Amino acid sequence: MIFRYFVLLLLLCSTQLNAQEYSMGANFNPSTIAATPQKIALSFRSFAAMPASYSLEQYCPTPGNQGKHGTCVAFANGYSIATILYAKTHNITDKAIIDKYVFSPTFLYEQIKSANDTDCQFGSDPITAIGAMIDLGEVFMNKVPYACGTLLPNAAKIEAKNYKVKDAAVLFAAKGMSVDDVYYKEPTDMINVTKKALTEGTPISGGFRLPESFFKIQSAVWTSDPNEVNKDWKHNGHAMAIVGYDDNVGGGSFRILNSWGNQWADKGYVWMRYQDFTRYCTLALQVFADPNTMPPEEKKPSPTPTPQPNPKPEETTFSLSGNIEFKLNTGSDMTVNKISTRNLTVEEDVKGAKEDLVAYTMNGIYPSGTRFRFYMNIDQEAYVYAFATDLTGKVNLILPFADNVSTHVGSNSTIAFPSDTKVIQLDEQKGTDYLLILYAAQKLDAKDIVAKMNGMQGALSTKIKAVLGNKLIDKSKITYDSDKVGFSSKGHSTRNLTVVEDSKTATTGSVVPLMVEIKHN
C-alpha cells in the first residue's frame, strides 16, 4: 500500500514538473477582444479552392525560447509573426538572414507588461501586443536582446517606427470571450477561416488554453488525451503562431510555431490536429504585413553602383484588382454595361471626358420587389467599402455594416452582400439607385467619407472626387472591364499609401471606385 502511494506521488510530481518546465503567459481580455474588429464573413466561394496544404515555414525564424518568463505573447507575435511577415514581404528564405533580422520579444513585452511585473511573470494580452506592433512597431533582437527588465533606449523606439505591422482582425473567439458570443464560430468554420487566412499569406496569432498532454509531447503530431481537462496553472493561457496546415497530417492538422526552443516536439514546431485546435484555441487573429517596412541590407541596392545594375532593383509595389457580380435570387446574372460618366449620366465615350470617373449601368430595368445579391471578388489584398444612395441623394454606408467588422481581406476572396443566404429587395420607391464600391490599398475612414459626402451638394461622382481627392488612383492607370463590373490596376509604389492631403502632390493614389447604376420601376 505504501509502495503504491509512493508510485502515485512520483507520477503526480512528474506531471507537475513537466508542466512547470515550460512557461506560458497569455492573458485573454474580453474587453480588448470586443474593441477589435472581426474579419468580415467571406462567401462560401472563398473556401472552395483551398489547397490540401499550405506553409509559411520557409519564412519562419529558428524557434525561440522564452525560458522561465511569461513572455509567450511577445514571442508569438513579435519574435515569430512580425519576423515571418518581414521575411515574406522582402522575400527572404535564407534561414541565417531571417535569424539575423528576427524581431525582439523584449522590446514588445517591456512596452505592454504590467508596471509591477518586474520579473516578467505576469504575462500579457495578445491584442495589446498586436496593437503595439501596429502603432509603435518593432526592432530587431540584435538591437534589444532578450532579457527581462531591459530599459528600452529611445533610439530603438524611433527605429521601431520603420517596422510596423499593418493591421489585424479577429478570426474567432471561444464562447464566453465576446459579448453575446458574436465572435464565436462553429468548429468547421474555425478551421476554414484559419486555413483561408493562411492561404492569403498571413500567419495567425493563436491564443490557447492547453491541457497537460501538450507539455509532454514527444512526437511531431500532438495527440491529446480525450479524458483530460484544462488545469488552472499559473498561466493557463499560451500564445503561439499558426504558420501552416496539412489536411493529410493526423487527419488534418495546423502547423504551430512555439516558443519553447528547438528541442521541443518537432524541432520547436508541432502539428495540432484540427479537432484539438477547435477544442483548445481560444482566440485567433489574422495579422497583415506593412509593405513599407525598410528592407534588410541584403536587399538594398548600392547607393551609387557602377555600372548601373540591369535590370534596376524595383521598389515595393502594390496591385489592386477585382470584380463584382450581380445575381438575381434565381441565380441569373444581372448584366451591366460600362459607361463614361459625367455626374453618373450616361453618355458616349468622347474625347475630353478623361476627367470623369468610370461607372456601370444595369442593362435591365428591374421591378420593385426584385431580389438579388452581389458578390465582391477581391484578387489582391485590399480594404473594401460599399455605399448606396437613395432617391434623395443621401449616401448610406452598407459595408462595413457594423463598427466591429473589418473589411480588410486577403487575396482570392469573395464577399457576398448581404450574405450567401440573404438577398436585397428593391423597395416600392421607383427610380434610380446608385451603388459605390471602393477597393483600397489602405484603410479608409468610411464614416467620415459618408459624413463629408452628405454634407455637400452635387452628384455622386462629384462627391467622390471631392472627398477622396488624390487618394484615387488615376483613371488612366486603371483597366476597367467592359462587360462586367471589374478592374485591374498594377505596379503602384507603396510610397503612395502614405501620401499626405496635398492637391499638388503627384501620386497615383491607392483607391479604385466602382459605381453602378440600378434602375427599377
Predicted stretch roles:
Residues 83-94, 143-145, 217-220, 253-255, ...:
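Short, solvent-exposed loop/turn and secondary-structure capping segments
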Residues 19-101, 120-141, 205, 274:
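Structured alpha-helical subdomains that flank or immediately precede key functional sites
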Residues 72, 237-243, 369-374:
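Conserved beta-strand/loop element in small beta-rich adapter and peptidoglycan-binding domains
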Residues 290-521:
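Secretory-pathway glycoprotein ectodomains that are cysteine- and/or Ser/Thr/Pro-rich
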Residues 103-111:
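Short, conserved phosphate-binding/catalytic loop or strand-edge motifs used
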Residues 23-24, 78, 82, 112-257, ...:
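Predominantly the structural core of cysteine protease catalytic domains
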Residues 5-13:
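Sec-dependent N-terminal signal peptides
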